Regions:
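A short SAM/SAH-binding and catalytic strip from SAM-dependent methyltransferases
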Residues: 107-119
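Class I SAM-dependent methyltransferase SAM/SAH-binding core
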Residues: 52-97
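Short alpha-helix
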Residues: 169-189
Length: 224
């Protein structure tokens, strides 16, 4: 059984999100590429893996009227999110239990987490089930064979400084690019259009991987 919730509750990790990933300038170009075109007044957004709800703050820079629901496995992150954005909805969920997520949203976001947990396919399925229109997700891709073995590719929790007292690691999933598209297409049944954008970059600084270059790839999956 994974210990991912405890990993994201680590003080050094929580403190990183106190001041990062809260404004448009903080998000990656790959994330903004599709999201900026989806923003519309009055829209509803589901953010899976919301951390401290930073996307609520970012979206508020561009929209006056929207509803935002964020879910995360970290109790510490959700507590901070509720303090920062009391006007929005936040829920703690278990990694394989999204029963607190109800209804459908104009846009579902799953950004920055799929490559860092084992049940990422199920997470895509949940996000797709709960969108009325569009799903935006990102993966870390390679042209070589897929690596989903935590013994070969993993992510340490040395975010915002080292954490010598905590030895647990997360998977750092590297998905073959051709296989990734097949997976997204097979999960998102009934999709009318799948758009893709990505670029080459170094792996995360806290990751240990068998490759020195990956693709940060974002998918926009749209219903008819």
């Amino acid at each position: 059984m994974s210990n991912n919730a405890e990993s994201w509750n680590q003080p050094n990790v929580v403190s990183f999100f106190d001041t990062n990933r809260t404004t448009t300038s903080d998000i990656y170009p790959s994330e903004w590429f599709f999201l900026k075109e989806q923003l519309k007044e009055g829209m509803s957004i589901l953010d899976i893996g919301c951390a401290q709800g930073g996307f609520a703050g970012m979206i508020a820079e561009h929209l006056n009227d929207f509803t935002y629901t964020g879910v995360d496995i970290s109790e510490e992150m959700i507590s901070k999110a509720k303090e920062k954005y009391p006007q929005h909805n936040f829920h703690i969920v278990k990694e394989n239990d999204y029963s607190k997520v109800t209804g459908k949203y104009d846009v579902s976001l799953v950004l920055g987490i799929l490559h860092l947990h084992e049940s990422w396919r199920n997470t895509i399925q949940i996000a797709w089930n709960h969108t009325k229109s569009s799903l935006i997700l990102d993966l870390r891709e390679i042209f070589e064979e897929t690596v989903e073995d935590k013994n070969k590719s993993y992510f340490t929790m040395d975010i915002n400084g080292s954490n010598e007292d905590y030895s647990e690691v997360l998977p750092y999933n590297l998905i073959n690019s051709g296989e990734a598209l097949e997976i997204v297409n097979s999960i998102c049944t009934g999709a009318e259009k799948i758009s893709y954008y990505g670029y080459s970059q170094d792996p995360a600084k806290t990751a240990v991987t068998p490759t020195n270059k990956i693709f940060a790839s974002v998918y926009l999956v749209q219903k008819g």
